[in-house]
Amino acid sequence: MMKRKIGLDVGDKTVGIAVSDPLGITAQGLMTLERVGIRKDTGKILDLVKEYDCDTIVIGLNKKLDGTDSIQTEKMYEFRTMLENKMRSTGMKDIEVVWQDERLTTVMAEKVLIEADVSRKKRKQVIDKQAAVLIMQSYLDSLAFQKK
């Protein structure tokens, strides 16, 4: 059986988190983490990596539609660096960290939630988790496509 993968939609206030099923076919929303500080945030994420026995962390990379970096992209680079530093310092060297293009995932997530008739208040609570599901599923689909 394959190890799971964990997907992250990193924002300024929250991190949407999703995990793959053990076969690496589908993504399920796990939680929306309220951000409190980079050290605690990365610690909580690495706890989830251990708990779900993940071998890959997939981080949504937020670029502008034309493919250039945005202010948010720079924050993603910084987040990944801090996460990898924490992984090294805690002996988690075998975990792969990869980028997944996340342009428009939040827009798509909102559309899915609206179509499912989720109230505006509830959408706000689950939008980042849903975006993480889309990031994770996109990554899993790309792996399946590469195997063909």
Regions of interest found by a model, annotated:
Residues 3-5, 12-148:
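Phosphate- and other anionic-substrate recognition elements at nucleic-acid/protein interfaces
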